[in-house]
């Protein structure tokens, strides 16, 4: 079954609030085998909402509306749909009693417009609103399913979980949806796609969906099957084919982010870490400490932004700073080695470079060096040539630090 989500509210079009309901519903619907191919946002306008309904009826089996069920004049979702379907609106006695009781308990006047919230489509299944006033409803008519939900997420989400999803399962095939996200770093989206293009072109079940986000690339594998274990087998087969080709860039699944994977491996190896940050100004250390229990492996860091700190605290030779410059392979090497020794850690990592927007030391923005000094191992410096805004370059540099740390830890 194919669905369209129609969010109603001028405040959404004006950007005053984000349409988080659509994200929530899309994820939930996918998990029970309902495809969402369109998101529509329409303002509080009867004519435009009617047009949106007509368009959606041409391309979807299920229309899911959020918003416009309240007591004011511009809350017109129910009225517009009732007119479109030639259905009457009738009072739901349970909802009316619940709303009336609320006003009695709070000592407020129960005005006529508040009674409007208890109106539902005649013949609809009513979804109780346990966290607000206006009930939701579902109606199957003319081969289409119409779902009306309140706009506030704190009302809509629990209503969906408790009442709507069980109702929707009557319209599904019983197939289970299983998804797995593969996370990659150090390879661009276009490069990765080239290596797995034939798999993407031939996808059926499971499907393969690439997504690039802030220097990372993910592949979401999604399979449908009535037996979840069989769905997992379908996923695993395609994953194996993908990792045969781009496994060197793979680092984790789903919500396993780079900093988490690197720190977990650090704990597993029983090694300690120290960082020297010039370019990143503490971003790397901040992400390290987002991980619980990290004090067992993280000694600390030095923000060595000024050359005086590089020279007098981390003992980068003056001739390196004056000849090679602070943005250099040699400087990164000294920073990594000396912060490791200073803080008595097993591993030292360093970041130096040009974040921009202007050049520095005759080096262009995006010129970055990440140093990695591991006890009893040769020091390695990774030169990077990054693009983006000042903040993006700094954040991506920190990510590359975690990536190279993770890959090096895998080797030892």
From Swiss-Prot:
SUPFAM superfamilies given in the database record: CinA-like, Molybdenum cofactor biosynthesis proteins
InterPro entries reported for this sequence: CinA, CinA-like_C, CinA_C, CinA_KH, Competence-induced_CinA, MoaB/Mog-like_dom_sf, MoaB/Mog_dom
Pfam families cross-referenced by the UniProt entry: CinA (PF02464), CinA_KH (PF18146), MoCF_biosynth (PF00994)
Gene3D superfamilies per UniProt: 3.30.70.2860, CinA-like, MoaB/Mog-like domain
Transmembrane segments: none
HAMAP family to which the protein is assigned, alphabetical: CinA_B
Similarity-based family: Belongs to the CinA family.
Protein name: Putative competence-damage inducible protein
Organism: Bacillus cereus (strain AH187)
